[in-house]
Regions:
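A structural signal for multi-pass alpha-helical bundles of membrane permease subunits
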Residues: 22-308
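Short, Lys/Arg-rich, polar N-terminal cytosolic tail immediately upstream
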Residues: 1-20
Length: 308
């Protein structure tokens, strides 16, 4: 007589392993995240890639059009303007946010009640809901009655036409992004705590100046953390422009703040051109990936040069 293992007996043996063994507990705790990532990120991304090659308006069935949507993007002045504005924002906002987070972390990494309160104040804008944050800046940037221009007028400085002219409006969006660097500040505060104090004591004994110590000890040891923040900001910063551009300017003035997320929304939900919107999203994936790969390769080559 042959013995067979029934599914019920196999599951009975599997359940104790899942609950008691270390590997089983690791899988048990990571399974919700893996399932959520698969269902909410990976599958929608794959579906989006498929829709990019179709003509789809959510009413009629999708119709295969090949690369027509990508040709339409190349020929669209608005799509080219949106991509250029988005890249300009990234090239200004990402380095500025990284430098701001590093500066605040260096100033506030000491202990004490004052520094603890200052860290909380620096982190506070990060937890404000994006809609409320955008409405607050809509009031601050009012060119006639906003507190920013009133303060500049009291100091005898020029009062830019925020939200009216293209240049000041683009600068205003970069300025808004600088007040939500709390997460980067926290990461760099943790990084500063991981640097052994013995390095600074040895440098002090050798008579090194504060600038030399920062340049030769602190900055090199922070570079991996700063690279992580740079890659994160490349992906996240552009996404975070949607609420601000939707609430404050709706892409204006003169399409200056029609960044890719807002244009995606307009194509999909104003014009119901889901195929073209999906193609634009695929292009944004490719551009973001190229930027990330370029930065990683640049840092890798720099590290090899230093090692040589």
């Amino acid at each position: 007589m042959t013995q067979s293992t029934s599914p019920s007996s196999a599951s009975v043996r599997f359940l104790p392993w899942l609950l008691t063994s270390y590997d089983g507990q690791v899988w048990l705790f990571t399974l919700p995240f893996l399932l959520g990532s698969l269902l909410l990120i990976a599958l929608p991304a794959l579906v989006t890639v498929g829709i990019a090659f179709t003509q789809y308006n959510a009413i009629e069935p999708p119709r295969w059009v090949g690369l027509d949507n990508f040709y339409r993007l190349i020929e669209s002045p608005l799509a080219r303007l949106s991509l250029r504005s988005s890249l300009q924002f990234l090239f200004l906002a990402v380095p500025s946010r990284l430098l701001g987070a590093l500066t605040i972390a260096l100033l506030l990494h000491r202990g004490g009640r004052f520094f603890i309160g200052s860290r909380a104040a620096a982190y506070l804008p990060t937890i404000i809901p994006e809609g409320a944050y955008a409405l607050l800046w809509l009031w601050i940037l009012n060119p006639l009655f906003g507190p920013l221009n009133l303060a500049l007028g009291w100091m005898g400085l020029p009062q830019p036409q925020w939200l009216i002219e293209s240049g000041p409006t683009r600068l205003a969006f970069v300025l808004m992004s600088l007040f939500t660097i709390g997460e980067g500040m926290v990461v760099l505060l943790v990084a500063l705590r991981t640097i052994p104090r013995a390095y600074y004591e040895a440098a002090r004994v050798d008579g090194a100046t504060a600038l030399y110590t920062f340049w030769r000890i602190t900055l090199p040891l922070l570079l991996p953390w700063m690279l992580l923040l740079t890659l994160r900001d490349l992906v996240v910063s552009l996404q975070n422009t949607f609420i601000a551009s939707f609430v404050i300017t709706y892409g204006g003035p003169y399409y200056a703040t029609t960044y890719i997320p807002l244009l995606l929304y307009e194509l999909a939900f104003d014009f119901f051109d889901f195929g073209l919107a999906a193609a634009l999203l695929v292009v944004s994936y490719i551009v973001t990936g190229m930027l990330v790969i370029g930065i990683v390769n640049l840092v890798g080559l720099d590290g090899e040069d230093h090692a040589a």
